[in-house]
From Swiss-Prot:
This is Protein-tyrosine-phosphatase MKP1. GO terms for biological process: defense response; response to L-glutamate; response to salt stress; response to UV-B; response to UV-C. Residues 1-73, 94-118, 488-586 are annotated as: Disordered. Phosphorylated on threonine and serine residues by MPK6. The modification Phosphoserine is found at S558, S572.
């Protein structure tokens, strides 16, 4: 062994020389006395310190320093160095708040001797190391740089943090008029007397639900835009929450993907960085606002109307349920069931009126922003029709009949108790805001601002309702600019609206007007052909609290008709439409009104309204497969045709219970309809196919079906392919630029013909061109 070899090697050394020991001989903990053989101990003969004395046998070297304290050899050893434990610098570890900036530095695990060869684990294939040397500190410095920055994302949208929200001078310098506070539980409404506020209570957590409030935010952004205002959207630092809402808006408004919208916002505000949960929700939102085809797992979606946050219990939003089935319904609430064939609003027997109203508004938002083309039906607990349960069974085959046997009013889901309790206390006046506004620190009752989101929906609804009652005598235009809404002229007494809504017409997305025959969500204009297929999107949130019930009209459209025609309503002379987006950009001249379309782009005639007030709202499903926003209606009750076409758009119309008359028309003594030739209005008593002259325009009132069982009539305007306006220009409004037959608004002419023929003003008008499909008209003529 080493210690023994050293001792033996020193036997031949000259007397008086130092005895050298290896440190390992004294520090070897593995060597024990029992391991040394007895023969070895006898062979260890070490010379004595006195050179003249004989050799003597010495005991073996001590095992440890502690076992031999007085040895001279121990004194000869170099002093032992203390063990060095190096502590890592504090800067190399993550600091508090690193998760707030979105990046975690990844320091190596503390190790011993770095110069020696050690086993290393290569994680390059599984984890990408942060290569930016300034990742943590620079990120915080960057946030500090944007602390006082009011970042402009769009003409009317600015993004920032709390530091800007509390600085009135910065807000004023940027022309801010409205503020959306995303962190109501942290930041109060600092300058409520100077700006219009709305608040959300969003946690910067991946589990926070932002999908349910996106459409309310879209409404707010559009409301600000129509007022030519500017809105400042802020959270604490302007990094995650506020930027997520703006990204979602750009995805809908501009038709951008999530990546494009995110990069656009990030170019305006370099620290924009939605958390992972928000990003996932925005990717799901992208599929909806771009009208992507539904996946098999998304065929059935069910929403429960509930408060978005306990801080604002009257802000009701549709929250997506994880288990969509009849067992998820609760008699205390309102639910939205979205199927490929229809959208149902299920109202429980104990549901409050406020919740039912907001559910109807939420459905209109879904139809508008997601471009839903399905009928919308309201069913009440206990009165569910059979087709309602059949719709469930078609998606969930395992649903049995036992679901229907639940007693009406007894449906209850315990998981909803907290939401309903919060909401019930709020409507009973038991809710007091946790954070008083800056200019009133003594609020002891529920302030109006706590329900501001519902009031915004009512604002759109009231304006839309006024338009409907006004149009009962003069139909609205079916071809809209990107604003899609019609504004009353200043001279019309019935056009009085609030000051906040008269600045400009309501503003809808240009992407909400798209080609009906294309799966692409973006709009498609065709200037070369002089016509395009435009499908108006659903109107803004509609909430009409004065109406008490909703019913569904049966479809009166034949399969051919549902695939075929599409006419256009003429705007009232007392109304004007805002210029379209294409016109404002200068890329499209003239009106986007397209009276003459191919057969594939035509639809059934537009609806008309009864002038008197009504107590019912009817979701009419007739003739809107190709984008008719306002289909016709004779208001014949609430019976439902189970064979309704799947793709139809909602149309909200009013009709009186006491005025459900049948549309009539003039006939001769033999019962044959009286036709006339336009513009001379020459009556044609014996109508036949021979009278369909290529150089004439013939107005023909005919039954809506071949057998005439429905009793309703349509006014068909047959336009010959050789008809010319050369001698009839005076009969066409010169303001409409009707230089050709294609540019004539034949629906307006049809309304004039209705008056001259003493036909009901609500008679649907259909345009039939000789150069296009005439199958329906010829079939009706042959049946006479």
């Amino acid at each position: 062994m080493v210690g023994r070899e050293d001792a033996m090697g020193n036997d031949e050394a000259p007397p008086g020389s130092k005895k050298m020991f290896w440190r390992s001989a004294s520090w070897s903990a593995s060597r024990t006395a029992s391991q040394v053989p007895e023969g070895d101990e006898q062979s260890l003969n070490i010379p004595c310190a006195i050179s003249s004395g004989p050799s003597r046998r010495c005991p073996a070297a001590p095992l440890t320093p502690r076992s031999h304290h007085n040895s001279k050899a121990r004194a000869c050893l170099p002093p032992l160095q203390p063990l060095a434990i190096s502590r890592r610098s504090l800067d190399e570890w993550p600091k508090a708040g690193s998760d707030d900036v979105g990046e975690w530095p990844h320091p190596p695990t503390p190790s011993g001797n770095k110069t020696g060869e050690r086993l290393k684990l290569d994680l390059s294939s599984t984890q990408q190391r942060v290569t930016d040397k300034s990742s943590g500190l620079a990120k915080r410095e960057k946030i500090a740089f944007f602390d006082k920055e009011c970042s402009k994302v769009a003409d009317h949208i600015y993004v920032g943090g709390d530091a800007v929200a509390k600085d009135k001078s910065i807000l004023k310098n940027n022309g801010i008029t409205h503020i959306l506070n995303c962190v109501g539980f942290i930041c109060p409404e600092y300058f409520k007397s100077d700006f219009c506020y709305r608040s959300l209570w969003l946690q910067d957590s991946p589990s926070e639900d932002i999908t349910s409030i996106l459409y309310d935010v879209f409404d707010y952004f559009e409301d600000v835009r129509e007022q030519s205002g500017r809105i400042f959207v802020h959270c604490c630092q302007g990094v995650s929450r506020s930027t997520s809402l703006v990204i979602a808006y750009l995805m809908w408004r501009e038709g951008q993907s999530f990546d494009d919208a995110f990069q656009y916002v990030k170019s305006a505000r370099g620290i924009a960085d939605p958390n992972m949960g928000f990003a996932c929700q925005l990717l799901q939102c992208q599929k909806r606002v771009h009208a992507f085809p539904l996946s098999p797992t998304s065929l059935l979606r069910m929403y429960k109307m509930s408060p978005h946050s306990p801080y604002d219990p009257l802000h009701l939003v549709p929250k997506l349920l994880n288990d969509p089935c009849p067992g998820s319904l609760d008699s205390r609430g309102a639910f939205i069931i979205q199927l490929p064939s229809a959208i149902y609003i299920w109202v429980g027997r104990q549901c409050e009126t406020i919740m039912e109203k907001d559910a109807k508004a939420a459905v209109c938002q879904i139809a508008r922003y997601e471009k839903v083309e399905a009928p919308i039906m309201v069913v009440r607990e206990g009165d569910e029709p059979v087709y309602y349960w059949d719709a469930f069974a078609s998606i969930l085959p395992m649903i049995g009949g036992s679901v229907i046997k639940v007693q009406p009013g007894d449906r209850k889901v315990d998981a909803y108790n907290l939401d309903f309790e919060i909401f019930q206390k709020a409507i009973e006046g038991g809710f007091v805001p946790t954070l008083a506004s800056s200019n009133n620190e003594h609020e002891t009752h529920l302030p109006a601002r706590e329900n501001s989101w519902s009031s915004l929906k009512c604002k759109f609804a009231s304006r839309f309702d006024k338009g409907f009652r006004y149009v009962s005598k003069t139909p609205l235009s079916r071809v809209y600019s990107d604003s899609m809404m019609i504004v009353h002229s200043s001279g019309s007494p019935s056009s009085t609206t609030s000051s906040s809504s008269t600045a400009s017409p309501p503003f809808l997305s240009p992407d909400s007007v798209c080609s009906t025959n294309s799966g692409n969500s973006l709009k498609s204009f065709s200037q070369s052909s002089g016509r395009s297929s435009l499908r108006p999107s659903i109107p803004p949130s509609l909430t009409l609290p004065k109406f008490s019930s909703l019913s569904l009209l049966p479809s009166q459209t034949s399969p051919k008709e549902s695939r075929g025609v599409n006419t256009f309503l003429q705007p009232s002379p007392n109304r004007k439409a805002s210029p379209s987006l294409a016109e404002r950009r200068g890329s499209l001249k003239g009106s986007l009104k397209l009276p003459g379309l191919a057969d594939s782009n035509r639809g059934t005639p537009a609806f008309t309204l009864h002038p008197d007030d009504s107590n019912d709202i009817v979701f009419n499903l007739e003739g809107i497969r190709n984008g008719d926003l306002y289909p016709p209606s004779d208001c014949k009750g609430t019976s439902v045709d189970s064979d309704l076409p799947e793709k139809e758009i909602i149309s909200l119309i009013s009709c009186s219970k006491s005025d459900r008359h049948k549309s009539g028309g003039d006939t001769d003594s033999s019962g044959q309809p009286l036709a006339c030739r336009w513009p001379s209005m020459e009556m044609i008593t014996k109508l036949s196919r021979a009278y369909l002259d290529s150089e004439s325009v013939i107005a023909i009132p005919l039954p809506s079906d071949a057998v005439g069982e429905t009793g309703s009539r349509n006014l068909y305007i047959w336009i010959g392919k050789s008809f010319s306006l050369d001698n009839n220009c005076s009969l066409v409004d010169s303001n409409k630029a009707a230089d050709t037959v294609e540019n004539v608004d034949w629906v307006q002419i049809g309304e004039s013909i209705l008056c001259q023929m003493d036909l009901p003003k609500d008679t649907p008008i259909k345009i039939v061109r000789e150069s296009e499909d005439q199958t329906e008209l010829l079939a009706l003529l042959s049946a006479l």
